[in-house]
Amino acid sequence: MSAAPAPSRLIVKVGGAVARESAGRILGLAEEGHQVIVVHGAGPQITREMERRGIPVEFVQGRRRTSRAAVEVVRESMEQVNAELCAALGERAVPVLGHRDGLLAVPVPPLGQVGDPLPCRPRKILQALSAGRVPMVAPLAVGPLNVNADDASAALALGLGAKRLVFLTDVPGLFVDDELVDAIDAGRATRMLDEGRFEGGIVPKLRAAALAAASGITATIGNTLVVA
């Protein structure tokens, strides 16, 4: 008798704007037998709280400039969204707080308390997967350093050997010249990014998807497939 195929391992990135609404789809993937690692953002929550406290909000190529005061807002907001998502998924979810559980990053001093994530294999994630549970990753790195959740998703996909990287967003996919595209290759995506053809939150998503695709990982942004 042949052995049953190993379950596929996939990273699901959910934005703070759609995090709670994504619980059903995440559970569905897990129930299909996939090993699902969720990386969530908290962008809207962070921005609201920074504005409430009078902390300047500034983005550089889709990444948040983060002062020492701002990184505390990031931590609090990430922990809040993480707890809400874990509650929505129920007992299957395992909270993984990156700054405590080994998410590694290289500091980017010009942006303040910000880091570029490194491919890594946090022990708590591996333990959760072995137990058939769903790690819920808040992407604040050891430091603490604010790490863009899209970049963290790609780094974890590489470090954990994921087969797929799925971006669940509040937009249907990637638009090129105002047209929704079904697919784009990583090389073209990278060239267009270098040319400044995109702006805002799609920049880190496409950059992360292109990095993953170039490494052989199937990446999707909404309904758009990013291929090698």
Where are these regions (language model features)?
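C-terminal catalytic "cap/lid" subdomain
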Residues: S2-A228
